[in-house]
Amino acid sequence: MLKIWGRDTSSNVQKALWAAEEIGLDYERVDIGGPFGGLDDPNFRALNPNGKVPVINHDGSILWESNAITRYLAGLDPSGKLWPTNAHQAALADQWMDWCNSHLWGPFPTVIIGLLRTPPEDRDDDAIASANETLEAEWAVLDAQLAKMPFVAGDNFSVGDIPAGVFAWRRYELPIQRNDLPHLDAWYARLKERPAFKKIVMTPLR
């Protein structure tokens, strides 16, 4: 049995939930973090000493860090549909997962917190605009990759698309300036056709 700790509005938790849905894995989810609190509870800290979500328990095996969890869940699928069989494509999937953490995650909280969780009169509009400008430059890097292939690692959807897809939903839903990135647009349209993406990621931002 798979148990996932984390609120369903968290981008990092959504990675794990999306992967589980893609492979049809049953799971139980526990609300924790954000408005639910509980991250400093000793029982939760025993699961993840960092006090962050998501955390999973799969048949007694505990794991934290969203990308590690997403990779792990993808590996549970006997069909292997989320992992490219080609070694280079598998490495590309890994590459773009890591790229999200190193290039998108840094400026994203400034935009999310500024627009969703800060009253208009208290917002630092210059900081939000600067962070979004940085993000748009990063999205252009992914757009260039998607000019060569329909998904980040090749012709088929893979685990490598999941982290970027979670961030992309926020890019397209937030009231921000977006540059013209046609290949990113086409990729995002393909993601929106996936039932698991619709169920897990396409939810109100808050």
Which residues fall in each region the model found?
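GST-like domain detector, emphasizing the conserved glutathione-binding G-site
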Residues: 1-9, 14-129, 143
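Short, cationic motifs built from Arg/Lys/His that form the positively charged side of catalytic pockets
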Residues: 14-17, 190, 194
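A general structural signal for well-ordered secondary-structure junctions
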Residues: 26, 50-53, 79, 103, ...
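Conserved beta-strand edge residues that scaffold enzyme active sites
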Residues: 34-35, 160, 205
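GST-like fold's C-terminal all-alpha helical module
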Residues: 92, 100-193, 200
